């Protein structure tokens, strides 16, 4: 194993309840649209523009959809800033283990720059991660489920994506990871483990980061 790449939302923090509320608030305020739980999970893990196009039945696309996504993310940042939430159990200890063993690791998230900057501030991520090596939605590449974001993250780390482990919690994220060539582990994130095992090509499923270690991950490549 040469490196590890983490998705963020739903993988390093369980923020589904916060993000769901943010999307429902925004959809109602902006479009007078009542977003259902089923729709939330349908779009979860995809770029915000995909949500907007779906909510508006394709009436809003392109730059206008990007503007709407940015407005929604302002709502999310406000909601997250006010929430009492921490990194998933075992994450900090796992980061420390990776640092101690000089294993490169980074984040690949569909979130935009403002969001990842908030994540770094709220969760003190600077002690483990280099922001310049994180991949996030800057509008220059296709979002998940396309493989681009994980290929970019691996390149920033200077590692071979085919020798990386990716941690993901959504169907589109898992597809992005394995399409790039990585081994993908599914994060349960409070859901039924059987639902995560249904995601194509996951090599393992975990509840939190107390269930993984370097030795176990290295076995995936033998």
Question: Model regions: which residues?
Answer:
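Asp-based, Mg2+/Mn2+-dependent phosphohydrolase catalytic module
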Residues: 1-2, 96, 112-113, 118-222
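N-terminal helical cap/lid subdomain that shapes the substrate entry/recognition surface
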Residues: 2-93, 97-101
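Ser/Thr-glycine-rich phosphate-binding loops at phosphate-binding pockets of nucleotides
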Residues: 11, 15, 109, 173
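Conserved SAM-binding loop
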Residues: 12, 87, 105-108, 166-167
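Short glycine/serine/threonine/alanine-rich loop segments
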Residues: 32-33, 103, 159, 182
């Amino acid at each position: 194993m040469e490196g590890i790449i983490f998705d963020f939302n739903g993988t390093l923090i369980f923020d589904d309840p916060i993000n769901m509320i943010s999307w429902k608030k925004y959809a109602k305020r902006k479009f007078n649209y009542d977003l259902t739980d089923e729709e939330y999970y349908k779009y979860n893990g995809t770029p915000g523009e995909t949500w907007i196009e779906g909510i508006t039945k394709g009436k809003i696309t392109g730059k206008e959809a990007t503007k709407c996504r940015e407005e929604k993310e302002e709502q999310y940042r406000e909601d997250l800033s006010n929430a009492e939430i921490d990194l998933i159990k075992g994450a900090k200890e796992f980061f420390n283990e990776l640092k101690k063993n000089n294993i490169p690791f980074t984040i690949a998230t569909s979130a935009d720059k403002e969001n990842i900057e908030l994540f770094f501030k709220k969760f003190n991520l600077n002690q483990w991660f280099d922001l310049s090596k994180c991949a996030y939605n800057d509008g220059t590449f296709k979002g998940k489920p396309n493989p681009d974001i994980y290929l970019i993250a691996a390149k920033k780390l200077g590692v071979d994506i085919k020798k990386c482990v990716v941690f993901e919690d959504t169907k589109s994220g898992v597809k992005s990871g394995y399409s790039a060539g990585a081994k993908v582990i599914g994060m349960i994130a409070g859901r039924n483990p059987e639902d995560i095992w249904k995601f194509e090509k996951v090599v393992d499923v975990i509840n939190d980061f107390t269930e993984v270690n370097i030795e176990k991950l290295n076995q995936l490549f033998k």
